[in-house]
Amino acid sequence: MGSKTPHNHRRGPNESSSPPAIDAINPPKQAAASGLVHGSLEGESEGGEDEDDDKPGADLKAVGQIGNDGQKRNKRKKKKKKKNTKELEILQTTPPRVALANIFRSQRYPEAEIVKYSTDNDNLQRTTTEELRHLSVLNAMDDEFLNDYRKAAEVHRQVRQYVQTIIKPGIALSQLAPEIEDGVRALTNHQGLETGDALKAGMAFPTGLCLNNIAAHWTPNPGAKEVILQYDDVLKIDFGVHVNGRIVDSAFTMAFNPVYDNLLAAVKDATNAGLKEAGIDSRIAHISEAIQEVMESYEVELNRKVIPVKAVRNITGHNILHYKIHGDKQVPFVKTQTNQRMEEGDVFAIETFGSTGKAYLDDATGIYGYGYDENSSTTGLHHSSAKSLLKTIKENFGTLVFSRRYLERLGVQRYHLGMRSLVTNGIVQSYAPLVDVPGSYVAQFEHTVLLRPNCKEVISRGDDY
């Protein structure tokens, strides 16, 4: 999910993005099975009945006494049947609806792409002060942190690989969005219908389904005109998955007409260039320059006219915080002047947008979604409907971005007046669709990368992109 560059925004080198640490509960480990072997008492049969000492011909022997044949009395031992401990393998369904917890019984999820840091890093020796400043971030990047991220990434991979098989000309976008979101909720095993359940795991923000010159922040909403995918469309699919507030943000573009192949290749290569340059102490200005250089080395031919691919100037990649899709660091797609660097423990969404238009985005009409600002003041809030709605938002979404569809899914009704009051008072921020000029085409690719102490993990990397 792209972060739009605000007007008159200045990025300082000392901005902090340390997410608060959270307490996570480890699943209990299974105790090793143990048991006691019970033998029959001397003088009792294996069936538990006393032997009859008065039985004619019975030999009376003390415990351990040697019989006439010189052998100790041995009792027959029942052979124990070996239990088949092998568990049946559970496979994912099509569409994916089996919770990952049922497939990964150990609750350990696969690593993504691991990239070792270059040994020629020009600033590997960080000062003690900087290390102390990031100590809380590094402490939070423990096994639970990594496992939550890997689970969210695995959900994203399985869902997107399925939806790529059903995205074809003729599909309605109002049908596609629920396919993605229902898959995420099924695989995380959190439907989000009970109060607070969506904060445990599920959608990190509404599914973005943006056609052609619509670059970002469009999703089907109730009452909107139906949109059907066409052969000549360029469709960007951008959705996020979170587990315990650890957000994986990843996006890709699909087109059916091969005339757009170079546009998609330009953006995918530019994103990979940004991922290659990302790392501890990497200068954001250097990353931006590398992205632009790769992106703008491509051109496309549309209607017998050669058009250069341009890097979009006023939307950026961004760092990700706990339960917050947008942090305070931005990664532009064009050369910029900033002293800001990436830091150990950071989580970044490295994304790029390339356009055949003017490569500058404007707000369009309509609302994509909403996000609660936890630092806002509610002193000016007087409408009871607004207060009730705010309570619902806090309990079910917190600072995660949500849409009207998500509210109505919870059964919330007649919320428009209350929402208007929340937006007017700056308590909730609204997001509008972002568009380039009509007739242009925009593509997007995006991955989430974790800057771990000894390597970077492109957590959302898959076989598809």
Curated annotation (Swiss-Prot):
Residues 1-11, 73-84 have a biased composition (Basic residues). It is found in: Cytoplasm. Its EC number is 3.4.11.18. Binds 2 divalent metal cations per subunit. Has a high-affinity and a low affinity metal-binding site. The true nature of the physiological cofactor is under debate. The enzyme is active with cobalt, zinc, manganese or divalent iron ions. Most likely, methionine aminopeptidases function as mononuclear Fe(2+)-metalloproteases under physiological conditions, and the catalytically relevant metal-binding site has been assigned to the histidine-containing high-affinity site. Substrate binds at H217, H326. A divalent metal cation 2 binds at D249, H318, E351, E446. Residues 1-89 are annotated as: Disordered. This is Methionine aminopeptidase 2-2. It comes from Ajellomyces capsulatus (strain G186AR / H82 / ATCC MYA-2454 / RMSCC 2432) (Darling's disease fungus).
